[in-house]
Amino acid sequence: MANLYMYFWEKIKVWRKEVGDFMNLHDFVHGVDPTIKLVIEDEFPGTRCVGGKYVPSTHSIFLYEKDIKIQCRHLFGSNECLESYQWIILAHELGHALDEDLLSLSAKFDQTEDIGLLYQIECNAWEIGKKLIPFINSELFSFIKDESLAHYHKEMDKIS
């Protein structure tokens, strides 16, 4: 995993020299893995507020702009850190896309419905994602990650 991190960090440094400090999300995803498709839509088609999702069957990441704004406002009371929040959501979804264990963990979950497996899937995505965006404030990243994982902690506490 350390080699993967160093590989991506070196790519990020090169990209930042080429495009300055601003990098768009599509270019970033393409630089990480050109086989991943990024789709940015206005809002999630269901009733839940979903900022992003990864679809393994199409190797696609979907980001939902309105939902990301709603989540950011809900967590922080404003959209002051919206750009960083969007990068964090993208990095998390990239974490799913790059997780070599995702398919096997998902298959095990389908068989067992063990919430611990879902928690592991999410933790893997957060761990991988964090390494992709060292230019984002680490305390902000940790806060968002912890908020995201809180639901799983509550569910696992009910079981034990």
What is each residue range found by the language model?
Residues 1-59:
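A metal-dependent hydrolase signature that marks the N-terminal structural subdomain at the beginning
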Residues 6-14, 80-84, 118, 127-160:
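Long, well-structured alpha-helical subdomains associated
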Residues 13-15, 72-80, 109-114:
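Short, flexible/disordered intra-domain loops and linkers
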Residues 21, 87, 121, 125:
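Hydrophobic (often cysteine-bearing) scaffold residues that line and stabilize catalytic clefts
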Residues 40-84:
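Active-site scaffold of zinc-dependent metalloenzymes
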Residues 77-90, 114-120:
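Glycine-rich, flexible loop segments associated with nucleotide phosphate handling
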Residues 85-102:
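Active-site recognition of the HExxH zinc-binding catalytic motif
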Residues 100-127:
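Post-HEXXH active-site segment of zinc metalloproteases
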